[in-house]
Design a protein with these regions (language model features):
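Sec-dependent, cleavable N-terminal signal peptides
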Residues: 1-43
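Solvent-exposed beta-strand/loop surfaces, strongest in extracytoplasmic domains of secreted
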Residues: 22-25, 38-204
Length: 204
């Protein structure tokens, strides 16, 4: 029996014999198709590329990204590089780490590739705001309060003013000097702020 066969049939309603052409696959042809498909699948090697998650503070450079390639045949020269759109100026948040395969010897066609992106998490940078301690005599006006803002990134302009509840009429004692931040750059949300009050000592 050949791989392709022709058959005839009689139509029951009229009793007239009409030759109908049917094209059927024999068992041999069907097996050939199935085996060919299986062979093509068997020649495709699973390759899984996974980027490792990473993290850094706002304003810092990106770390060296890493990851894994699983399923690479011995001797194949496929490598991977990792990239993200995030840079030191990127706001706090999550960014994809995307693997890109490098195939100098055109071997990638032998693989069925699965790509798993990683996540770069940018967290708020620590910002320390401190008011300096100072003393004065009772009955005197408050001096100009000073302090420091430490940990600014990317040229951000965030300053502090300092104030105290004490007045010239306040009795001798200790009073808090409280910093208040002024966010000229609009980037205060990218910082984790710690505030250290100063102390105004009013002497008798």
């Amino acid at each position: 029996m050949s791989d392709l066969e022709r058959t005839s049939a009689t139509l029951p309603p009229t009793g007239k014999s009409t030759r109908l052409k049917f094209i059927t696959l024999s068992v041999t042809a069907l097996l050939f198709v199935l085996l060919g498909s299986m062979a093509a699948q068997a020649q495709t090697i699973p390759l899984v590329v996974t980027a490792t998650d990473a993290g850094r503070f706002y304003g810092d450079p990106n770390p060296a990204f890493t990851g894994t390639i699983t399923g690479l045949r011995s001797g194949d020269t496929i490598t991977v590089v990792f990239n993200t759109v995030a840079n030191p100026g990127s706001a706090v948040g999550s960014y994809q780490i995307v693997p890109t395969l490098v195939d100098p010897d055109n071997q990638l066609g032998a693989y069925a590739v699965t790509i798993n992106n990683g996540t770069l998490t940018v967290t708020p940078a620590p910002l320390l705001v401190m008011a300096d301690d100072v003393a004065r005599a009772a009955g005197s006006p408050n001096p100009t309060f000073t302090g420091t803002v430490s940990g600014l990134k990317n040229g951000d302009v965030i300053t502090a003013t300092h104030d105290s509840a004490a007045t010239a009429d306040s009795p001798a004692g200790s009073y808090a000097i409280v910093p208040t931040l002024q966010d000229q750059s609009g980037n205060l949300g990218n910082y984790s702020v710690s505030v250290a009050n100063g102390t105004l000592t009013v002497k008798p």
